[in-house]
């Protein structure tokens, strides 16, 4: 299922990111902030565990603690730009990495790196990547995780288009997809339009 997270702060910060004049420092800062705002909503249905603590007054207070572990899995390299924003709100989360590159001729995703913490298979996995264009990278990352026994997976992207959304819904109907915005289409080079440019280059200032 697709979830578009609508919030004025997200829309304002996304506008800054779309602006071609925005430098990589501000681009990265706004991506971090949007990621934090999104995970607040994404974890709204998280089932926290009841827990009791003793306060400084000596009284007992009922509260909540994390139950299942949460693992943030950025798709390298652009996904790294969303990791800090999520872990700022969920510092207990562990971090894995999946490395995929896009074949410039076939546009297919190829895996070159996979490293996930040793956690229970029912842990909540947040796959993060700013752009959901063709959906190839996200689709392959999810397949890699499922092949290794993980089933509680959510996909978190900043901007997506119908092509990528349809691919994930077709191949992974059990995976909830979260977007800050749904854009219009892909151009002939498979870039999102209007989009925000090459997310990896704009995060790391490599272009």
Curated annotation (Swiss-Prot):
Q: Which Pfam families match?
A: UPRTase
Q: How is the cofactor bound?
A: Binds 1 Mg(2+) ion per subunit. The magnesium is bound as Mg-PRPP.
Query: According to the UniProt record, which cysteines are disulfide-bonded?
Result: none
Which transformation does this protein catalyse, written as a reaction? UMP + diphosphate = 5-phospho-alpha-D-ribose 1-diphosphate + uracil
Query: What regulates this protein's activity?
Result: Allosterically activated by GTP.
Residue positions annotated to bind 5-phospho-alpha-D-ribose 1-diphosphate are 77, 102, 129-137, 198
Report the GO molecular function annotations. Answer: GTP binding; magnesium ion binding; uracil phosphoribosyltransferase activity
Q: In which pathway does it act?
A: Pyrimidine metabolism; UMP biosynthesis via salvage pathway; UMP from uracil: step 1/1
Q: What is its EC number?
A: 2.4.2.9
Q: Which GO terms describe its biological process?
A: UMP salvage; uracil salvage
The residues that hold uracil are 192, 197-199
Q: What class of enzyme is it?
A: transferase
Arranged from A to Z, the UniProt key words for this protein are: Allosteric enzyme, Glycosyltransferase, GTP-binding, Magnesium, Nucleotide-binding, Transferase
Cofactor(s) needed for function: Mg(2+)
The record's function comment reads: Catalyzes the conversion of uracil and 5-phospho-alpha-D-ribose 1-diphosphate (PRPP) to UMP and diphosphate.
Return the NCBIfam families for the record. PRK00129.1, upp
To which protein family does this belong?
Belongs to the UPRTase family.
Which protein are we looking at? Uracil phosphoribosyltransferase
Gene source species: Mycoplasma mobile (strain ATCC 43663 / 163K / NCTC 11711) (Mesomycoplasma mobile)
């Amino acid at each position: 299922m697709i979830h578009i997270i609508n919030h004025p702060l997200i829309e304002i910060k996304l506008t800054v990111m779309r602006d071609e004049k925005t430098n990589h420092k501000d681009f990265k800062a706004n991506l971090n902030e949007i990621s934090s705002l999104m995970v607040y909503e994404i974890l709204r249905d998280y089932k926290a565990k009841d827990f009791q603590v003793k306060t400084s007054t000596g009284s007992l207070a009922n509260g909540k603690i994390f139950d299942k572990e949460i693992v943030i899995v950025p798709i390298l390299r652009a996904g790294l730009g969303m990791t800090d924003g999520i872990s700022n709100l969920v510092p207990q989360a562990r971090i894995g990495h999946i490395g995929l590159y896009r074949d410039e001729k076939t546009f297919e995703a190829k895996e070159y790196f996979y490293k996930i913490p040793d956690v229970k298979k029912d842990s909540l996995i947040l796959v993060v990547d700013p752009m959901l264009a063709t959906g190839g990278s996200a689709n392959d990352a999810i397949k890699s995780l499922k092949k290794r026994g993980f089933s509680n997976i959510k996909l978190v992207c900043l901007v997506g288009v119908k092509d990528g959304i349809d691919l994930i819904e077709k191949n992974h109907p059990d995976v909830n997809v979260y977007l800050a915005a749904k854009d219009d289409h892909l151009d002939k080079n498979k870039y999102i339009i209007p989009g925000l440019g090459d997310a990896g280059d704009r995060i790391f200032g490599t272009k």
